[in-house]
Amino acid sequence: MKKYVVIIDLHCDPTIPSGAGDIGGGNTYSRSLLQELQKHNINHIYITRKKYPHLEEYISMTPVCDFYRINLGDWGPIDKDVLQNYHLRSKELIIEILSKYKDCSFIFHSSYWQSGMLAYDLAKQYKTFYVHTILSNAKKKEQTGAIEDIVKQRIHEEEKIFAHAKYLICSSLSEINEMQELYAIPPEHLILAGLKVDYHYLYPAYNTRGEVRINTLGNTIAEQIYL
């Protein structure tokens, strides 16, 4: 039986670069995830939201990657705090996509809480498990004074998502602490994942003489080595 990792990531389209329109840093994580799955030849289905009508709804990216954008009928950037209103329609469309994969098994990986709602439901339906990337959590935001109209709903959903995920992927030690202290998640269910650091950030921008290490074209000056 062929196995697939199904990535559910409604609020980040990894094919759109960070800084384009409303696209933020979450896309950097999503793109890294997509690249690593392809790099290691892991069969996967990536599902995000179709933001613009000119974007394809399906792309066969590589022999191991099928990429889908589900059409929720609302073009352009939308506030990520309303994605839960599309839950039932999103679930229907994802089930429709997965029905094309006969005699296959699935493992779900969701990113951010509304996609976690889908992974929770679908994992139960397909009798499998899911892992979840947190990105942020409502209890911490509430502690720091952030105001959200949907905070109670979000906390309720996050408690369910976090408690039932096989693993939670955290971006920092502080996030691991938040999961343990605010959501009572056992440490064995928490994974600390990092992002690749670009080589430009591995060395200081200036040498000991105050000279710029990188020339105006952005290239490292190869004949000089600075510690």
Annotate the PLM regions.
Residues 174, 196:
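Carbohydrate-associated surface elements
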Residues 208-227:
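Conserved donor-binding/catalytic core segment of Leloir-type glycosyltransferases
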Residues 5-6, 123-142:
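Active-site proximal beta-strand in glycosyltransferases
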Residues 97-115, 119, 128-131:
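Short N-terminal targeting/anchoring amphipathic segment
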Residues 150-168:
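Membrane-proximal helix-turn-helix segments that form the acceptor-binding/catalytic region
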Residues 109, 164-173, 191:
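A short beta-strand/loop micro-motif in the catalytic core of glycosyltransferases
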Residues 1-59, 65:
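N-terminal subdomain of nucleotide-sugar transferases
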